[in-house]
Amino acid sequence: MITVDFGNRIRELRTKTGLSQEKFALKIGMDRTYYASVESGRRNISLINIEKIADGLGVSLNELFAFNKENDND
């Protein structure tokens, strides 16, 4: 599921920064519980918030969406 794949990707990138969910959410101006639900794949996210996450992580949108989709055959 794309929301889970996206959540796993942003978790991977966030942990590389050394920031907790709370500190990262604060950095990008997002509520921690909302961010946590996106990272866990339980919530859809708007394009505006995707851009905030990419900017906060210092990556391009292409890099943000560079997760492995080989198991998705539908």
Each model region followed by its residue ranges:
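Recognition helix of helix-turn-helix/homeodomain-like DNA-binding domains
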Residues: M30-R43
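DNA major-groove recognition helix of helix-turn-helix/homeodomain DNA-binding modules
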Residues: N49-E63
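Conserved hydrophobic/aromatic packing and binding residues within compact polymer-binding modules
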Residues: I10, F24-A25, Y35-V38, L64
